[in-house]
Amino acid sequence: MAKSKKIVFTGGGTVGHVTLNLILIPKFLKDGWEVHYIGDKHGIEHEQIDKSGLDVTFHSIATGKLRRYFSWQNMLDVFKVGWGILQSIAIIAKIRPQALFSKGGFVSVPPVIASKLLRVPVYVHESDLSMGLANKIAYKFATTMFTTFEQSKTLVKTRHVGAITKVGMTRFDNSDQLDKIKEQFDEKLKTVLFIGGSTGAKVFNDFISKTPELIENYNIINISGDSSLNTLERHLYRVDYVTDLYQPLMDMADLVVTRGGSNTIFELLAMKKLHLIVPLGKEASRGDQLENADYFERKGYARQLQEPELSWETLKHELEQLVEHAETYKEAMAKSEEITSPDDFYNLLVTSISNK
């Protein structure tokens, strides 16, 4: 009797640490793998797995936040991480998987360490130009770390694969909701979509609310992350969260204003969408979005605007520059070789696991 194939996924805290897992899991299931997921039952990873309806066994563990600064909470979280490692050892020892795949986030650290201790191959994916703290730890225990960006040659366990995105051919959804949105929009105006990651961006939400010039000069789509803002009125559609409408709304947009998260900006690259990046600053993050934005600007894929400089005048100028030089930006995006299909990455991952 053939040995059953089993794989454990981990990663969470934000949608960005779950998205790739949700792309890969159906492929493993289709090929007959038994799939497990280790995460926090209160985290977005459990919510997303549950919502997906996929045949995945979810295992919840204790998690502690990894901080780069001093906090008394660090003392308590050391014990939480330790307990999470012990829980992960028990879970993984019982499953006996062929591999563990981690997409990062603080919840991934205990399963990664546990897998290494149990001699289970560990495969990690890093989306950003520089590693987050969780993946810096994970790298030490990894068999291979796949990266979106080229990394230093001193990081011998990394393998550059480019961005893995499921965005492909444009889909059109002729839903009633889409028709209602179009009725409120002016065909003579450019449509600008604001997207701020999995939880929206308060700075975009507040800016749209306080800048009437926006809806006088553009059709505005605001994916806000805040259901209290939901509205459909003249030149303005605000929605907290979208699934089926995501691609149709992107199709409607002439321009996109986004944060600098790797998943989103590479999706925009794959769709060849003109976009302006307003990255999170170092005061609110580790600076990864600033690095991503600099990289995209250097490559000629996008323009960037720092959050403290965001105003009606600066935004209008940046959007006008994107429109004026649209062909240059679209040509640079068309020449990009930084996108990897999910099928190609899946085949690479399965081959790597099989060779261990």
Curated annotation (Swiss-Prot):
InterPro entries: GlcNAc_MurG, Glyco_trans_28_C, GlycoTrans_28_N. One of its GO terms (biological process) is regulation of cell shape. It is found in: Cell membrane. CDD domains: GT28_MurG. It catalyses: Mur2Ac(oyl-L-Ala-gamma-D-Glu-L-Lys-D-Ala-D-Ala)-di-trans,octa-cis-undecaprenyl diphosphate + UDP-N-acetyl-alpha-D-glucosamine = beta-D-GlcNAc-(1->4)-Mur2Ac(oyl-L-Ala-gamma-D-Glu-L-Lys-D-Ala-D-Ala)-di-trans,octa-cis-undecaprenyl diphosphate + UDP + H(+). UDP-N-acetyl-alpha-D-glucosamine binds at residues 198, 289. This is UDP-N-acetylglucosamine--N-acetylmuramyl-(pentapeptide) pyrophosphoryl-undecaprenol N-acetylglucosamine transferase. Belongs to the glycosyltransferase 28 family. MurG subfamily. It comes from Streptococcus thermophilus (strain ATCC BAA-491 / LMD-9). Keywords: Cell cycle, Cell division, Cell membrane, Cell shape, Cell wall biogenesis/degradation, Glycosyltransferase, Membrane, Peptidoglycan synthesis, Transferase. It is a peripheral membrane protein. The lineage of its organism: Bacteria, Bacillati, Bacillota, Bacilli, Lactobacillales. Cell wall formation. Catalyzes the transfer of a GlcNAc subunit on undecaprenyl-pyrophosphoryl-MurNAc-pentapeptide (lipid intermediate I) to form undecaprenyl-pyrophosphoryl-MurNAc-(pentapeptide)GlcNAc (lipid intermediate II). One of its GO terms (cellular component) is plasma membrane. Its main location: membrane. Its EC number is 2.4.1.227. It comes from the Bacteria. One of its GO terms (molecular function) is undecaprenyldiphospho-muramoylpentapeptide beta-N-acetylglucosaminyltransferase activity. Pathway: Cell wall biogenesis; peptidoglycan biosynthesis.
